[in-house]
Design a protein with these regions (language model features):
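C-terminal helical cap(s) of enzyme catalytic domains, especially alpha/beta-barrels
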Residues: 256-278
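A structural motif
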Residues: 29, 105, 198, 238-239
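A short, acidic, flexible beta-alpha connecting loop/helix-capping segment that sits on the rim
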Residues: 12, 243-262
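A short acidic, helix-capping loop that chelates divalent metal ions and anchors anionic groups
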Residues: 41-46, 83-85, 114-119, 180-182, ...
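Active-site acidic/histidine proton-transfer and metal-coordination neighborhood
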Residues: 18-19, 25, 60-74, 79-171, ...
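Active-site beta-loop-alpha junctions enriched in small/polar residues
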Residues: 8-12, 35-39, 79-82, 112-115, ...
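Glycine-rich, proline-tolerant flexible connector loops at the mouths of alpha/beta enzymes
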Residues: 35-62, 115
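Acidic/histidine-rich catalytic cores of soluble enzymes
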Residues: 3-5, 21, 32, 100-102, ...
Length: 278
């Protein structure tokens, strides 16, 4: 059975969501991961958001028409907003969950946060449980990013999952971030340890060097065994979304839309060769 393969719109760099909607089908995909941005905040990629926390019902209808016109579906939303230890981030996250629900999305990706002291960690857990309960009421599962903090590596992911035990708080495993944020980690072994908690994945390649910003088209980094990733996840009952994420290389200049599209096409071809579409 073919997996659900999508693409995070920031993979198109400064061309963003509009370009993703217009060009993904030509790259062989029909689904994407849509960021819902916090109004008034900039994007590190320089792209214009399709949806923000200030989006009106009319704005959402325009976005839905855009997707319908290009026969593209939203597989998930990215609702990253900051550290949920902050009460304000919880409120923003709830707003983003409401917007995702309006768009018919059942999976979102967002930060799990970080806390240095036991008292702060207990508060973070309470805030995440509140987010999970709110997501559950909307029929959504919130999937934690592989970012610094309580989901930085597989050890902390398991600790967090066991502490929360919430059916609507799960993991988004990022195949490159696990190497970028941790030294001496085997990414596929880490994935195997937590695969039963994974409900969403970011497929991202790298050189495998700790702290080195090098996230090219899939297959051009060499540190991630995408065949092995599929072999691990299929027996766990996971069939996607596998969301392609390409963040580029440190020091490279701005790419043209054609160059971004080439990276997406190359990534799709890599996954085809690895059996994701079989």
């Amino acid at each position: 059975m073919p997996a659900i393969v999508s693409c995070l719109t920031t993979s198109y760099g400064r061309f963003g969501g509009q370009a993703a909607v217009e060009h993904l089908r030509a790259a062989g995909l029909e689904s994407l991961e849509l960021p819902i941005r916090t109004a008034g905040t900039g994007s590190p990629f320089g792209d214009e958001p399709l949806v923000t926390t200030d989006s009106s019902l009319a704005d959402l209808k325009r976005v839905e028409r855009l997707f319908d016109d290009h026969a593209i579906r939203i597989a998930s939303c990215n609702v990253t907003s900051g550290n949920p230890l902050d009460r304000g981030v919880v409120a923003i996250t709830k707003r983003k969950l409401e917007l995702a629900h309006h768009l018919g999305v059942e999976l979102v990706v967002g930060g799990a946060g970080e806390a240095d002291e036991l008292q702060s960690l207990a508060q973070l857990y309470r805030h995440l449980t509140e987010i999970g309960d709110y997501a559950a009421g909307l029929g959504i599962t919130y999937c934690f990013e592989t970012h610094p903090g309580i989901c930085q590596n597989h050890h902390r992911m398991l600790e967090t999952m066991n502490a929360l035990e919430h059916p609507h708080l799960k993991l988004n495993f990022d195949t490159a971030n696990i190497l970028y944020y941790n030294e001496g980690v085997n990414g596929e072994i880490a994935l195997a340890k937590v695969c039963h908690h994974v409900r969403h994945m970011h497929l991202k390649d790298s050189l495998g060097e700790y702290g080195q910003w090098h996230f090219p088209a899939l297959g051009y980094g060499g540190a991630v065994d995408f065949v092995r990733v599929l072999e691990i996840m299929r027996p766990c009952g996971f069939n996607g979304p596998y969301s392609i994420e390409i963040e580029g290389l440190a020091g490279e200049g701005e790419l043209s839309l054609k160059e971004h599209q080439r990276r997406i096409i190359d990534s799709v071809e890599q996954l085809q060769n690895c059996g994701y579409f079989d």
